[in-house]
């Protein structure tokens, strides 16, 4: 999940540098969603291993 978040963050950065505002915004949203999901899954996995 972190890998996908980084990939979409890089796509957003490149798209914004090239002037594609819509693509940059969409890629940024996907990167944020993947990052949040990855953090939530990490926390759930960490808690389930401790109990």
UniProtKB/Swiss-Prot annotation:
Pfam families recorded: DUF1328
Localization terms from the record: Cell membrane
Transmembrane regions: 6-26, 27-47
InterPro entries assigned to the protein according to its UniProt record, in alphabetical order: DUF1328
Keywords tagged on the record: Cell membrane, Membrane, Transmembrane, Transmembrane helix
Membrane topology term: Multi-pass membrane protein
Gene Ontology CC: plasma membrane
Similarity annotation: Belongs to the UPF0391 family.
Protein name: UPF0391 membrane protein PsycPRwf_2202
Organism: Psychrobacter sp. (strain PRwf-1)
